[in-house]
């Protein structure tokens, strides 16, 4: 760790976790007995270590059809959603409750967090309460001034891969300011071929200095190609599994027997790239059998166990993918975050992980996968 003073250490009921606010390094012990680490991973934290805070209630990018144009089925239904953004006062209430308990806020919701009317104030509130903010953006409204704010306050920023000039422009603006920049790439049946093209090209050419896209002309020319290049200098590409939620369709879901997906997993398992490769926890059931992936790097669904989502109108959900039906919602106008976290509603959600697939050797690594959209679980075993 570069700066020990930036490392926050939290002692929970029977384990210890630590987070470095500068590097993003996270570590937790196994369950502790008599001061010794048993090696058994704790099931949950006593308070969410990460909160996905939905500060956006509507989306300019989605409203004008740009998500659909890029072939992305927005799980927040940004095409139709027209709710107000979270108020600054509500955000302050959240941050105050999380001070000293939560390491990170993932700013999100239905829209680009950098377009919130109080974006700078929100970042300042995070800093005042010792919480590191991160967020994902389409990049549609990214500016140099916003990129500077990101450098000043954020741990990292992810740009969704929308295959457009503004995608690359946003990435390059962030990189120019020294922001740790990731790409979020939605992995679906219709994007698998393109994902394979990216990885094969970058694996073969990872020592070649690729285009820097210094002008709008370069951007437009690049965007006319079948598959854009990931800009040089990005920290990681994080693959997010497509879910049939909101505008996402079941027809575009990946299945475990998809040959392109199996080839994709082989490539990730066998090769190295000029950037890190990551996945959301929804993909873990498909990753646990990869022999060159360190099992310690895999963490299955953390919803309701380590993290939670807060809607723009202040409902706590175990995961943002419950944003449409809100089956496991708890109203924060009536309960504190701590009370909602310990509620029967959240316990019902967690029971899925405790009781799923009890006889499977991978139970502790997978826990049965997603309780919200079980059809996305990429496992060839039925328990």
Question: Which residue stretches match the model-derived regions?
Answer:
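C-terminal accessory region of radical SAM enzymes
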Residues: 257-291, 315-367
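Radical SAM/AdoMet-radical enzyme domain recognition
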Residues: 88-110, 115-241
